[in-house]
Amino acid sequence: MSFNHREIEKKWQKYWEENKTFKTTEDDGKRKFYALDMFPYPSGAGLHVGHPEGYTATDILARMKRMQGYNVLHPMGWDAFGLPAEQYALDTGNDPAEFTEKNINNFRRQIKSLGFSYDWDREVNTTDPNYYKWTQWIFLKLYEKGLAYMDEVPVNWCPALGTVLANEEVIDGKSERGGHPVIRKPMKQWMLRITAYADRLLEDLEELDWPESIKEMQRNWIGRSEGANIHFQVDGHDETFTVFTTRPDTLFGATYAVLAPEHPLVEKITTPEQKEAVEAYLKQIQSKSDLERTDLAKEKTGVFTGAYAINPANGEKLPIWIADYVLMSYGTGAIMAVPAHDERDYEFAKKFNLPIKQVVAGGDISKEAYTGDGEHINSDFLNGLNKEEATKKMIEWLEANGKGEKKVSYRLRDWLFSRQRYWGEPIPIIHWEDGTMTPVPEEELPLVLPKTDEIKPSGTGESPLANIEEWVSVVDPKTGKKGRRETNTMPQWAGSCWYYLRYIDPHNDKQLADPEKLEKWLPVDIYIGGAEHAVLHLLYARFWHKFLYDIGVVPTKEPFQKLFNQGMILGENNEKMSKSKGNVVNPDDIVESHGADTLRLYEMFMGPLEASIAWSTKGLDGARRFLDRVWRLFVEENGELNPKIVDNPETDTLERVYHQTVKKVTEDYEALRFNTAISQLMVFINEAYKAPILPKAYMEGFVKLLSPVCPHIAEELWEKLGYSNTIAYEAWPAYDEAKLVEDEVEIVIQVNGKVRAKLHVPADATKEQLEQLAMEDEKIKEQIEGKTVRKVIAVPGKLVNIVAN
């Protein structure tokens, strides 16, 4: 008989909700465990089967930790600002707030149907003014400390969408959404000075229990490099420009310089003969994003300005070019090119027939750039020195002659924080007619997003908020001075930078969260989510956390102690699930056909949590069959408990496999090896089917071990075993090391290396006892009859080999 999952799952979900089973208390006597999921963006499409994979993993840990006596914080919320809702509003004329609310209600229903043990009283929503009041408060603090500032920056402007796009949203000069042309244009934007935290963001990675690959991605993104700034004079002008280089030792090999096309000097130094070519080039590259411009595989392009720089080391004239692979936003927007020892410079020099001068011995520079180490040559006072010595000496020379200085540079840029969007947190700043700006006073927060019937791009580069005159225009009540509110909104990253803090104290209207509660719950013990957030979200959240630490709001330097990325669930054909491919699996359908417990079990059993694995209906059916077997072992056809389940039996049936199961499942859950833990649960059930009687204590222990993965069926079986309370807070099973030892082992007996018999012997039998048992075995006696035994080799617990001829 199979169990009725629809009935059982609804029954227990109702029970948990009515009894607030998973409400987190501030119980001081217990150890704490904070299990966090990356909260979802509530899209119109609803939950897909990829979401529950990470959610089930944290839920298993949360449920186990409760049973181990921990006070567990396991919350859920919504990252609900963002582009898709705004795009929907633009397309349909509907309010993004209503659309978002509808989607959240659907997501919440779906998540509840999967039986996760969230404390729903702590739900947060980034679009709730009571939440974003504190997002705005953090912004004001950043502004107070000089970490939020306005700057004119070249941005990816998309005229059709009427907005600025992030680099990641531009592909081949077109918007990722809709494929509209994108151009680069300078605009005033809000920036956050994340670079002020670059060193700490780098160094503190060492203390975190994170996958090495994610740490490495963050290190590369921050991109710390040591070198020197070198100042170049422009020949015939009183202008200079600075380049940052990690190889100041190769300065004698510099044969040309390259400026970013946006560099302010370009206009001043371009000669009349080159003006037309330079302007044509600037027009040509207008639609390329930074990512495309720096693509190593792309053909190099560039144009000569007609001007020359003076090499400070030897007075030689270097032609100044512009090329799109040099970015104004990286380093100083200018490079010195040493083509003999840099692949990119070499390629450029070959293409445009520029000189190549070797200054480090080694390689064949007629064929390719030599990037290895060697003695310096053609380098005056550096000749004969190696890289390290030459670098040190050149920096000393530059500093002594006022031509440069030692410098640390970062790949990390300040964070472009404004979006020309309606559906985001308003930035609480007022711009006055006299050119000054002031923050909105703290007591006036939240600055609420105004309701509007018409969300359309302003077309001026401002957000749709610029169209709402009665909201934008303000008058200073004290002076009568007129002003306009900031019309840009914050990016979707803002709300997700600190949501894990709000869960700790979600209803506090006096402060972001109570310091005592933060002290108690931080840092997050396990954070599980997709690897696509490896760099930006995690870096931004760490930056805000460190800032909040500096101003005394949070007690820890880092937010997330342990991080884990689950893999992706692919379609049955091994392709990424997508609506266009028609291979999306909807969890609602699975909950209906197989049940939430089956879905949870299957997703944890598919393979290692970090692996990307194809969905398989056969695998799903297999998971359901296992749960049916479990049910049949406990429950008779008539719904009564199996009479084989007895209290205090006079036997040690199942003793060893039970203790092995408790040990393995506990260790595997802790280490997130859910697939091998489930295999062990299956081993136990197989053994139990062979047993003549089933000791009740072991069967209860099994149900407890199963409960974090399949909570509904576990609650039902717990009730069948005679308990009236939820299983959620029952004590986690313990194992006895002594019971894990096998009393008997099977050994093989070989004659001349061939297996002739197998014997069950006591696990602690000595060599002498094994020899004796082997020689007394009837089959072996037959084999060696009439032969002389030359040697007997006994390996306790394994084998006996008899050499006879």
Swiss-Prot record:
Q: Does the keyword Nucleotide-binding apply?
A: yes
As for subcellular location, the record says:
Cytoplasm
- For this entry, list what GO says about its biological process: leucyl-tRNA aminoacylation
What Pfam families does UniProt report for this protein, alphabetically? Anticodon_1 (PF08264), tRNA-synt_1 (PF00133), tRNA-synt_1_2 (PF13603), tRNA-synt_1g (PF09334)
Give the catalytic activity: tRNA(Leu) + L-leucine + ATP = L-leucyl-tRNA(Leu) + AMP + diphosphate
Enzyme Commission no: 6.1.1.4
EC category name: ligase
Q: Which residues are noted in the entry as ATP-binding?
A: 579
Motif 'HIGH' region per UniProt: ranges: 40-51
Q: Report keywords, A-Z.
A: Aminoacyl-tRNA synthetase, ATP-binding, Cytoplasm, Ligase, Nucleotide-binding, Protein biosynthesis
Q: What main location does UniProt list?
A: cytoplasm
GO cellular-component term (any): cytosol
Q: Does the keyword Magnesium feature in the UniProt annotation?
A: no
* Motif ('KMSKS' region) on chain: 576-580
State the Gene Ontology terms under molecular function: aminoacyl-tRNA deacylase activity; ATP binding; leucine-tRNA ligase activity
- The family this protein is said to belong to: Belongs to the class-I aminoacyl-tRNA synthetase family.
Q: Which NCBIfam families match?
A: leuS_bact
PANTHER family assigned to the protein according to its UniProt record, in alphabetical order: LEUCINE--TRNA LIGASE, MITOCHONDRIAL, LEUCYL-TRNA SYNTHETASE
Q: What is this protein called?
A: Leucine--tRNA ligase
Q: Which organism is it from?
A: Anoxybacillus flavithermus (strain DSM 21510 / WK1)
